[in-house]
């Protein structure tokens, strides 16, 4: 049965208009984005099938075009839509984070970092630069590449903080497909960076390690110098 034959109150678009987006399931929201299904499968049925295949909305939205194209009804158009949705969501979240008066809640930072870094396929490092009131000034990418290629120079982070007139900063990097547990190299790097930042009166508040499923805070683990 096509969605047009459903009772009006159960159709995803009508349901959204009547009850709001929060009332819709992941499959219903995805169906609105997909717009159409395939032969013998409504958009909602296709959405449910894709969610089951990929395991979560996040994994589906971040799937590579080649993997999406293996499913009937999916391809470059769907990949483009998903990429746009993710980027819009990331930018909205970044705006909300930047407009926050004070970043006193580590969970807010963790949520942003999970969204920003959690689905990256390579290791990416970023710095969150803050003013004296812990208000976000800017988010800057420090490096991108494989683990072997992902070299971060402490002097560059110091220069970045000074150029942005930051009073403090938070750094983060992801472990693609790995554990959020910090390595000995991560711990030693954090200590050296904290020492270097203290020489220019900039505080290193925390170091986060991000995976698609979790976020690890050095401060919460008692690893900050």
Swiss-Prot record:
Keywords carried by this UniProt record: Hydrolase, Metal-binding, Metalloprotease, Protease, Zinc
Motif (JAMM motif): 173-186
PROSITE patterns: MPN
Pfam families reported in the protein's UniProt record: RadC, UPF0758_N
Cross-referenced CDD domains: MPN_DUF2466
Gene3D superfamilies documented for this protein: Cytidine Deaminase, domain 2
Binding residue positions for Zn(2+): 173, 175, 186
GO biological-process terms attached to the record: proteolysis
Residues of the MPN domain: 102-224
Single Gene Ontology MF annotation: metal ion binding
Top-level division of the source organism's lineage: Bacteria
InterPro entries (alphabetical): MPN (IPR037518), RadC_JAB (IPR025657), RuvA_2-like (IPR010994), UPF0758 (IPR001405), UPF0758_N (IPR046778)
Signal peptide feature range: none
Classification via NCBIfam families: PRK00024.1, radc
Similarity comment: family membership: Belongs to the UPF0758 family.
Protein name per the record: UPF0758 protein NMB1038
Species name: Neisseria meningitidis serogroup B (strain ATCC BAA-335 / MC58)
């Amino acid at each position: 049965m096509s969605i047009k034959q459903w009772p009006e109150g159960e159709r995803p678009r009508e349901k959204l208009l009547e009850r709001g987006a929060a009332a819709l399931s992941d499959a219903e929201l995805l169906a609105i984005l997909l717009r159409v299904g395939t032969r013998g499968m409504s958009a909602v049925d296709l959405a449910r099938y894709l969610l089951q295949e990929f395991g979560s909305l996040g994994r589906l939205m971040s799937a590579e075009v080649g993997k999406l194209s293996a499913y009937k009804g999916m391809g470059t158009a769907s990949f483009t839509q998903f990429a746009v949705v993710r980027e819009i969501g990331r930018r909205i979240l970044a705006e909300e984070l930047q407009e926050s008066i004070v970043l006193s809640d580590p969970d807010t930072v963790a949520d942003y970092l999970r969204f920003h870094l959690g689905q990256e396929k390579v290791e990416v490092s970023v710095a969150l630069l803050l003013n004296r009131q812990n208000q976000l000034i800017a988010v800057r990418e420090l490096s991108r590449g494989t683990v072997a290629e992902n070299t971060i120079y402490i002097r560059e982070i110091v220069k970045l903080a000074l150029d942005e007139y930051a009073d403090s900063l938070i750094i983060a990097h992801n472990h693609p497909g790995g554990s959020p547990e910090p390595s000995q190299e991560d711990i030693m790097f954090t200590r050296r960076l904290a020492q270097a930042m203290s020489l220019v009166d900039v505080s290193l508040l925390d170091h986060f390690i991000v995976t698609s499923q979790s976020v690890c805070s050095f401060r919460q683990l008692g690893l900050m110098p």
